[in-house]
């Protein structure tokens, strides 16, 4: 199976970066534990919602790590962002990440990663600063992957200029 072309890799990494940056903004606006996000109901009570059961409200008062990722982009970009944050979590514990654009994992693996990140977010004593630091680690790794990603040669470049 041939490797994906350079433009596809760059597009996927840029989409991943956009989700990570959007999730960071969501978390800065408000962070929660015990649900994917909190919303204020019509009677003024704050309610936690988790996953698809909570719908996708236009405004939330706060998001957990996974909820912020889910709200920040399209499903394919969100999936890759989940993988990037999961890899950043392991890197923060001294385990090297795969780097670059790893293959898309099976749905069961991604679901396990979502559970792990949800449990990590919800651990007693966890702080918003720790969550933001993890997202920052994923953002930094994604930027480094973008810098190292292959680039397509311009079609009109002279042969001596083309990478080869």
Task: Label the model's feature ranges.
Residues 1-164:
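Domain-length accessory/inserted modules outside core catalytic folds
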């Amino acid at each position: 199976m041939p490797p994906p072309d350079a433009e596809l890799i760059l597009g996927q990494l840029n989409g991943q970066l956009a989700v990570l940056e959007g999730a960071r903004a969501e978390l800065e606006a408000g962070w929660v534990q015990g649900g994917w996000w909190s919303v204020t109901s019509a009677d003024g009570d704050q309610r936690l919602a988790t996953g698809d059961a909570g719908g996708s409200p236009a405004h939330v008062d706060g998001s957990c790590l996974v909820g912020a990722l889910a709200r920040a982009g399209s499903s394919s970009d969100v999936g890759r962002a989940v993988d990037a944050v999961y890899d950043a979590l392991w890197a923060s514990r001294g385990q090297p990440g795969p780097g670059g654009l790893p293959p898309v994992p099976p749905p069961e693996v991604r679901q396990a990663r979502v559970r792990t990140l949800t449990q990590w977010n919800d651990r007693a004593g966890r702080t918003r600063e720790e969550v933001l630091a993890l997202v920052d680690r994923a953002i930094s790794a994604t930027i480094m992957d973008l810098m190292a990603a292959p680039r397509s040669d311009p079609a009109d470049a002279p042969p001596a200029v083309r990478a080869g």
